Amino acid sequence: LSDYRTRHSQYKLDTMLQNLHQQYPFYTVWDDHEFANNSWRDGAENHDPSRQGDWNSRKSAALQAYLEWIPIREIDVDNKFKIYRSVKVGDLAEIFFLDTRIIERELETDTDGPNKRLIGEVQMDWLQQGLKNSTAKWKVIAQQVMMGPLLIFGITANQDQWDGYKIERKRLFDFINNND
């Protein structure tokens, strides 16, 4: 916990960031580095349980420091890890903030597996219902990773984004295309 707190306190020493916070409001969603590099629901690329302890304890410590240093409204009192939410900007836009890192994300193996999840069923259902029921002119999806394919010489270049979860991405894109 102290390491995460120290990291956040160091970021806040940046005078340009201080000026930015003074002038503008923020809507935030964490990325993997708030926990550990290339993290997912049950672990992280650079998490070593023998040196760093239990992954769930580490996630909880990272979350606590995040919430101490980056104030956001509590979304679910029973699940502090639930950060996905939507924000309306009048009748012009509704921004849907996703969690593509911690809640349901599985390790990106077997990219074509039919049950692979980046955001999971609960968040997918929430997003689809929100998009369908929104009366805003613009519906914006804000999240941490690239949605569009990144191919180099026809080969998927980065599994650490929606490319690693092709079936779930297709399901979302199909929904958007069919509910325009």
Where are these regions (language model features)?
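Metal-dependent phosphoester/phosphodiester hydrolase catalytic core
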Residues: L1-D180
